[in-house]
């Protein structure tokens, strides 16, 4: 966790003071700087760019350098400190714990070495023991801002038989620049810091009771003459926390507790990528997968029933059946016939546009978006398959019905992408229909091959593509809005293929949202045509091509979404009259 945890004390002589703090070091220390739980030395590094971080970076130095660094330390001078303001003895190097899992080091000093961090901790210390106090002056509170960091502070009292009111005022603070993270960590920090405080108070209470039992001070205090000036009691008003708790290893224990607190709090909350609700494509794919699983289960059950009902085979029949198996269906023949995929394939929509030409590609894309049947005739089945793989990215998953390669024509209601071999005859009414487009792939002539260039460099140059349709309106009309935006992205050479793909995904999501609104408006609510026209104008889809596109894409909505809408409409709350 990128934070600082500090123990603060309100001294009767010097006011709020920072006693002990633990910070996180993300940079590895050189050899000799200490490893594990041990002592180490540090000096402030150069200020990091990009704002203040809740950690600093240190490097090892010699004792002579440590002395010079101590003289230039941002902390208070020795003359301004008493026993109650000081935690580590003069020349104490501090504590370092090394987390081998994350290569992070937790370093504890009395003050942060970085001047800006010292200022932040100092200000938080003063505010936690002066103005930012919860009712009762003992308990947790949250304060801070973007400039000086956000602070979780828990104030508490420690028993002292020589102090005013027999107690001294302390606080444990956790400083972080991330407000949301600190607020979310409130319950965890409150419980763990409260445990540290209870342990300190328990040790101090035992010392207090022992001192009171050995030498009661209450009568002496009550008889002391009043004076408006601060003065020491029994010559030692400023007692260190180690003497109050009678624990010489107190600071080492606090270092361990603070280091564990920083590590545990950082490991407790982790960032996760929230993808939101599943898209329509995801829902449709899940439904298709479920249907395939149901079909496979039904086939397995039917085969099991046939085996149970069938007569017992004579001895040796299984061997004869295996020998009758045709060579085409054997696994060995399939593996032997496997070859690497050919290079004569389309790689992307931009590649297809370059090969077909802008006018032919626009005609083809228009028919794809409108839901018309797209027929490819070629001897190369891999080429047809790659063309369909590229073209299907323009449509939602639910609108795609593909027959990759067939030896006979299939009707449009069965597929909107159909691959045929060259000898297959297409019915005349389909060729003349405005709801179909045919792409015929021919072998290029010798002259065109030399004109285009080397066949090995451009494998698709050995083909000629002829795009025909019974309706030439695709090239004449303005076309659907999504087609115009798509062509603008494809023609922009500053956009890479990956960026164009993401742009296409965003365009499909935008128009699928419009499809959902139109479906809810027309199919579920059954609004009149006048209201539907107003809605289309608001959606920016009042043109004829846009309306056709929305109606076709409506068929690609998932069954889950449709059933959810219908169940919502039929619920009692939905049947209440509208105000």
Curated annotation (Swiss-Prot):
Chain intervals with Low complexity compositional bias: 63-76
Pfam families on file: Folliculin, Folliculin_C
PTM remark: Phosphorylation by ULK1 modulates the interaction with GABARAP and is required to regulate autophagy.
Composition bias, Acidic residues: 294-308
Phosphoserine modified-residue sites: 62, 73, 302, 406, 537, 542, 571
GO BP terms, alphabetized: cell proliferation involved in kidney development; cell-cell junction assembly; cellular response to amino acid starvation; cellular response to starvation; energy homeostasis; epithelial cell proliferation; ERK1 and ERK2 cascade; hemopoiesis
Site (Essential for GTPase activation (GAP) activity): residue numbering on this chain: 164
Endpoints of the signal sequence: none
Subcellular localization, as worded in the UniProt entry: Lysosome membrane; Cytoplasm, Cytosol; Cell projection, Cilium; Cytoplasm, Cytoskeleton, Microtubule organizing center, Centrosome
Function: Multi-functional protein, involved in both the cellular response to amino acid availability and in the regulation of glycolysis. GTPase-activating protein that plays a key role in the cellular response to amino acid availability through regulation of the non-canonical mTORC1 signaling cascade controlling the MiT/TFE factors TFEB and TFE3. Activates mTORC1 by acting as a GTPase-activating protein: specifically stimulates GTP hydrolysis by RagC/RRAGC or RagD/RRAGD, promoting the conversion to the GDP-bound state of RagC/RRAGC or RagD/RRAGD, and thereby activating the kinase activity of mTORC1.
Subunit structure: Interacts (via C-terminus) with FNIP1 or FNIP2 (via C-terminus). Component of the lysosomal folliculin complex (LFC), composed of FLCN, FNIP1 (or FNIP2), RagA/RRAGA or RagB/RRAGB GDP-bound, RagC/RRAGC or RagD/RRAGD GTP-bound, and Ragulator. Interaction with FNIP1 or FNIP2 mediates indirect interaction with the PRKAA1, PRKAB1 and PRKAG1 subunits of 5'-AMP-activated protein kinase (AMPK). Interacts with HSP90AA1 in the presence of FNIP1. Interacts with HSP70, STUB1, CDC37, AHSA1, CCT2, STIP1, PTGES3 and PPP5C.
Family: Belongs to the folliculin family.
The name this protein goes by in its record: Folliculin
The gene coding this protein: FLCN
């Amino acid at each position: 966790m990128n934070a600082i945890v500090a123990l603060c004390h309100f001294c009767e002589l010097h006011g709020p003071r920072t006693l002990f703090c633990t910070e996180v070091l993300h940079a590895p220390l050189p050899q000799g700087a200490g490893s594990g739980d041990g002592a180490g030395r540090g000096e402030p590094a150069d200020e990091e760019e990009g704002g203040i971080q809740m950690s600093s970076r240190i490097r090892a130095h010699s004792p002579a350098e440590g002395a010079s660094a101590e003289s230039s330390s941002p902390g208070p001078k020795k003359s301004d400190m008493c026993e109650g303001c000081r935690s580590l003895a003069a020349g104490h190097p501090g504590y370092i714990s090394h987390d081998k899992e994350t290569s992070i080091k937790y370093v504890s000093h009395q003050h942060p070495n970085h001047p800006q961090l010292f200022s932040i901790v100092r200000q938080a210390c003063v505010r936690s023991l002066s103005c930012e106090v919860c009712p009762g002056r003992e308990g947790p509170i949250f304060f801070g801002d973007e400039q000086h960091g956000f602070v979780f502070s828990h104030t508490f009292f420690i028993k002292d038989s020589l102090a005013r009111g027999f107690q001294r005022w302390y606080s444990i603070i956790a400083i972080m620049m991330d407000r949301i993270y600190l607020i979310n960590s409130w319950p965890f920090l409150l419980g763990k810091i409260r445990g540290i405080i209870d342990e300190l108070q328990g040790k101090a209470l035992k010392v207090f009771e022992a001192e009171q039992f050995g030498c009661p001070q209450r009568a002496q205090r009550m008889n002391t003459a009043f004076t408006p000036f601060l003065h020491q009691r029994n010559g030692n008003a400023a007692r260190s926390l180690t003497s109050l708790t009678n624990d010489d290893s107190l600071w080492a224990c606090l270092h361990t507790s603070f280091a564990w607190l920083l590590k545990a709090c950082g490991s407790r909350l982790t960032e996760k990528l929230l993808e939101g609700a599943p898209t329509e494509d995801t829902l449709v794919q899940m439904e298709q997968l479920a249907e395939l699983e149901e079909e496979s289960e039904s086939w397995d059950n039917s085969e099991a029933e046939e085996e149970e009902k069938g007569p017992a085979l004579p001895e040796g029949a299984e061997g004869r059946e295996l020998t009758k198996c045709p060579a085409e269906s054997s696994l060995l023949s399939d593996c032997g016939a496997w070859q690497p995929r050919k290079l004569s394939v389309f790689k992307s929509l931009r590649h297809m546009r370059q090969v077909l030409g802008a006018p032919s590609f626009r005609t083809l894309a228009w028919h794809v978006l409108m839901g018309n049947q797209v027929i490819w005739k070629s001897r190369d089945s891999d080429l047809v398959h790659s063309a369909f793989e590229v073209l299907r990215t323009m449509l939602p998953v639910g609108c795609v019905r593909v027959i990759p390669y067939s030896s006979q024509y299939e009707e449009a209601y069965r597929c909107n992408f159909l691959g045929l071999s060259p000898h297959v005859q297409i019915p005349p009414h389909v060729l003349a229909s405005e709801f179909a487009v045919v792409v015929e792939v021919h072998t290029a002539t010798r002259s065109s091959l030399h004109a285009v260039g080397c066949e090995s460099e451009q494998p698709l140059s050995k083909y000629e593509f002829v795009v025909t349709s019974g309706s030439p309106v695709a090239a004449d009309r303005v076309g659907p809005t999504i087609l115009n935006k798509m062509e603008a992205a494809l023609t922009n050479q500053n956009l890479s293929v990956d960026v164009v793909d993401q742009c296409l995904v965003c365009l499909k999501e935008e128009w699928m949202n419009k499809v959902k609104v139109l479906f809810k408006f027309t199919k579920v609510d059954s609004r009149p045509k006048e209201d539907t026209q107003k809605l289309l104008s608001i959606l920016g889809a009042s043109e004829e091509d846009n309306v056709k596109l929305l109606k076709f894409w409506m068929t690609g909505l998932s069954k889950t979404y449709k059933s959810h809408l219908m169940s919502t409409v039929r619920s009692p709350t939905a049947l209440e009259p509208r105000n």
